[in-house]
């Protein structure tokens, strides 16, 4: 048995960041992880491995689509799937550097202030639940992670399948679907709703679907999946179209079930502790991430909010500061979201639909990458930047980007929103030329007297 100021259960982005910050603030800290490796889903079977695949296949796309346009001629590129798949222990070093105790094994909470790992029970003044999430799946579909897979299985396929059906047109489905489409698979995306990327700006969603269709992905929207049948090395996905209840089926070598994720809290003993839970399985936490059990906190995918690694990291740092007697800060209005397709999509703040529902008067500044010299020079001029600002005050309320390096460009607008900046503030800021980021300034100018290169 050991005594700690804080024990964090879960070593993913929220948990390990929380542990490091707690230690930096002078708290004796331990972090429990049972998966055998720190970093959680993001580092091991999620964000980082998928971005390695997305980058590799983006480069392949550039070779096939744009090299000849640039005057680069030569032998055709061949795909070595095994080498691509293998390019995927820095956190343990950070733990040692910051004097965080790493407890290997699955953790549970037998009583307030106690964490059991294996046969040992440790005590802590504060416990943080940072156990993340798992794929939610669909009723009636058996996941084997071989031919019917979640994102975990999709990142470790032995070979590129000839055909793939992706169930779900959210971030995970579109990213991995586009990877395999660029590698030569015939990819069909089946989505229950009538549009892809639920919750995203409608104009961006339509533009992304149009571009991905040109890249070879097929879309079946408004389709309710009924089940997956396995026979003779093939999977048959059965679905009905919601508009007329007609029945249909698609065969595929691999089926990727990308219908979302759910909090992973089983085995913690929360029910016996009397921890309040929400109807969808999240731990109920207040504005300081505290549960109804004294000394017990929860962050990341275990609580409400977008299931994003960077949201969990922010909460991890913030709750560490709360425990240390400081003020933890997370601005939930300024949490960006990114889809790492080609082109990338990024968003922060309000959408037009949300502002209309609120009845808030707003103005739109939009600029196409067709007017951006850098984007035109490298044949990546598809897409646009859209900035939404308050009609009266000009304060930036949201932004939506589809185009090259959108996931990096969005942060300029995040910083502006964090400081309560206006669109004019961005418009008055000199941007280096030629850069993609000039499109942000042009969109800000479009909120006022007009963009220059439109």
From Swiss-Prot:
It is an enzyme of class 1 (oxidoreductase). Disulfide bonds join 42-47. The active site is at 433 (proton acceptor). The keyword Oxidoreductase applies. Its main location: cytoplasm. Its EC number is 1.8.1.4. It is found in: Cytoplasm. FAD binds at residues 33-42, 51, 107, 301, 309. GO terms for molecular function: dihydrolipoyl dehydrogenase (NADH) activity; flavin adenine dinucleotide binding. InterPro entries: Class-I_Pyr_Nuc-Dis_Oxidored, FAD/NAD-bd_sf, FAD/NAD-binding_dom, FAD/NAD-linked_Rdtase_dimer_sf, Lipoamide_DH, Pyr_nuc-diS_OxRdtase, Pyr_nucl-diS_OxRdtase_dimer, Pyr_OxRdtase_I_AS. Belongs to the class-I pyridine nucleotide-disulfide oxidoreductase family. This is Dihydrolipoyl dehydrogenase. The gene is lpd.
């Amino acid at each position: 048995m050991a005594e700690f100021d804080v024990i964090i259960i879960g070593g993913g982005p929220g948990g390990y960041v929380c542990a490091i910050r707690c230690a930096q603030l002078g708290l004796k800290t331990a972090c429990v992880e049972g998966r055998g490796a720190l970093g959680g889903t993001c580092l091991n079977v999620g964000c980082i491995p998928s971005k390695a695949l997305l980058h590799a296949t983006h480069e392949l796309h550039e070779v096939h689509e744009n090299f000849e346009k640039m005057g680069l001629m030569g032998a055709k590129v061949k795909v070595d799937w095994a080498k691509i798949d293998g390019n995927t222990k820095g956190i343990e070093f950070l733990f040692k550097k910051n004097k965080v105790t790493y407890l290997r094994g699955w953790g549970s909470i037998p009583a307030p202030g106690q964490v059991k790992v294996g046969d040992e029970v440790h005590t802590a003044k504060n416990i943080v639940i940072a156990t993340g999430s798992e794929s939610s799946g669909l009723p009636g579909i058996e996941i084997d992670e071989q031919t019917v897979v979640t994102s975990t299985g999709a990142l470790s396929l032995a070979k590129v399948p000839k055909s793939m059906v992706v169930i779900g047109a959210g971030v995970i489905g579109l990213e991995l679907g586009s990877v395999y489409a660029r590698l030569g698979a015939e990819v069909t995306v089946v989505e229950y709703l009538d549009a892809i990327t639920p919750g995203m700006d409608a104009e961006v969603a339509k533009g992304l679907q149009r571009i991905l269709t040109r890249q070879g992905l097929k879309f079946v929207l408004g389709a309710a999946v009924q089940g997956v049948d396995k026979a003779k090395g093939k999977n048959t996905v059965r679905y009905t179209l919601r508009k007329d209840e007609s029945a249909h089926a698609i065969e595929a070598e691999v089926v990727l079930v990308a219908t979302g994720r759910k909090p992973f809290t089983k085995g913690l003993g929360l029910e016996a502790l009397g921890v309040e839970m929400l109807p969808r399985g999240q731990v109920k936490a207040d504005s300081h991430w505290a549960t109804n059990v004294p000394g017990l906190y929860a962050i990341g995918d275990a609580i409400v909010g977008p299931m994003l690694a960077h949201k969990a990291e922010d909460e991890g740092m913030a709750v560490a500061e709360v425990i240390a007697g400081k003020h933890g800060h997370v601005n939930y209005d300024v949490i960006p979201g990114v889809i790492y397709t080609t082109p990338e999509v990024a968003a922060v703040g309000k959408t037009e639909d949300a502002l209309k529902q609120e009845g808030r008067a707003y103005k739109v500044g939009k600029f196409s990458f067709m007017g951006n010299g850098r984007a035109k020079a490298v044949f990546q001029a598809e897409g646009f930047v859209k900035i939404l600002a308050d009609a009266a005050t000009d304060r930036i309320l949201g932004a939506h980007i589809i185009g090259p390096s959108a996931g990096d460009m969005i942060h300029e607008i995040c910083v502006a929103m964090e400081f309560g900046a206006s669109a004019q503030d961005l418009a008055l800021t000199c941007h280096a030329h030629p850069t993609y980021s000039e499109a942000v300034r042009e969109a800000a100018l479009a909120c006022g007297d007009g963009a220059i290169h439109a």
